[in-house]
Amino acid sequence: MADLMSDTYEYSSLANKYGNFYLPAVKIYINGTDILAAQKLFLEEISVVLSLDSAGSAQFKIGNIYDPPSRSFKSGIADKFKPGTIVEIALGYYSSTTKIMKGFVYMLGAEFGNKNLLVVTVMDVRKLMMIGGSRHVLHNVKNYSDIFKTIMSAYSRLCTPKVSATNDKLEAPVSQTGTDYDFIMDELVKKGKSDREFFVLGENAYFRERPKSAPAVLKAEFGRELLELEMDYSYLDMEIQVMGYNSYEQASYIGKSKVKSGEPQASLLTPTPVFAYSDPDADNQEKAARRAGAIADLADRQSKNGRLTMIGLPEIVPGRYVEVVKLEKMVNRKYYITEVRHRIGGAFFVTECDIGGFA
C-alpha cells in the first residue's frame, strides 16, 4: 500500500496507473467490503475534505434507490449507513483506487426533488474527539508526545497513532480541561508547547514535526495536472517572546524568536514589534526558546497563502508539498498543503488545495 505521507510520484506514472484520468472511481468500504459494488448502488456524487486544521469529512449521495410505488428507499440500504458505522473511502480511476479516509457515519439524511437521494456524511476521528465531552485529567508523564498517545488510545477503532516523540522532561503533571481535540490543538500545538502537527489521514493519526522542507509529492505543470493557481505572501516582521517560570528554582525564562518574511519587503518599524506569550510549562530556557520558535514558524506559514486546483489526484493530501514548475519565477516553488477537497460527480474529478506556507 502506498504511503501517502512519504511517497513521491511522476505525472506519467500516475497517468499510467489511472488510465489517463478518464473515468473516476469510488470505493466505500464497510467491514472490508465495497458497499457500492456489493449492493450495486449508484453514487451520484462525493466530496472529501482532508485538513490539518479541522476534522476531515466526506459527503456522498446515493441515487436510484427510491421506489415510488412503495414510497420508500429500497429495503435495508439506509441501515447500511446508520450513524456510528465505520467507513473507509478510496478514490481513483477505473479499477485503480487509493484509500484516503477512514471515519464514521456522523449524519444520515435524504434529499427529494429532481433526484431522490440518500445523503451520508462521514467524519474522521477528530469529530468524535470534539463531541466526546469535556475531560478533567492530570497527565503525569514526562513528554507531550506521551500525553498524545494516552489520549488517542481511546480511539483505536478509528485510528492508529503515528508519533514523533518529544523530549520535554516535564517536571509537573499537565492539566487537561475540555475536549481531547481542543486540548491537543490549543494547548499542545497552537501554543507551541510541542513543535508538532496533529492531523488524520486514512487510518493514521499523526503527531509529527512540521516539515520545513521535504520532497514534493508531485511536480505540477500548469495546463497539465495544474488547472489554476493563486498565491500571495504578506508583510511579516515580528519577534515572539515566550515567558516561563520555574517555581522550584524561582527563576524566570524568556525565549525569543524573530520571524521575517523570506520574500522581498521593506522594514517599517524599529525596533521590531514584540508579541509576548506566557507559558507556565516553559520551566527552562530551552523550552521557552523552543516554544517561541514554534509560534514563529506558525506565523511564517500563515503569512503565505494560496490555492491550487488540479485534476483529481487522491495522492494529493494535507501535510505534503506540491512543487509548481515551468510557470513563473515568483510562483515556481514548493507549496505546503493544509487542506484538500476532492470532488467527484459523473465524469469529473477535481482536487482543490489550500496553501499554508511555501519554500
Residue ranges, per PLM feature:
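Short polybasic amphipathic segments
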Residues: L23-G32, N204-Y206, I240-Y245
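An acidic/polar, Gly/Ser/Thr-rich interaction patch typically located in mid-to-C-terminal regions
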Residues: V48-K80, E225-A359
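Conserved "cap/hinge" positions at secondary-structure junctions
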Residues: L91, E209, K326-E328
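Short solvent-exposed strand/turn elements
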Residues: I65, N116-G132, F349-A359
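Short beta-strand-centered interaction patches in the first periplasmic/extracellular domains
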Residues: A2, S6, M107, K115-K127, ...
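Amphipathic, non-transmembrane alpha-helical segments in extracytoplasmic/periplasmic proteins
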Residues: N20, Q59-F60, V122, G133-K162, ...
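Assembly/oligomerization scaffold segments
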Residues: M1-V125
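Short, compositionally biased
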Residues: K102-E111, P211, Y335-A347
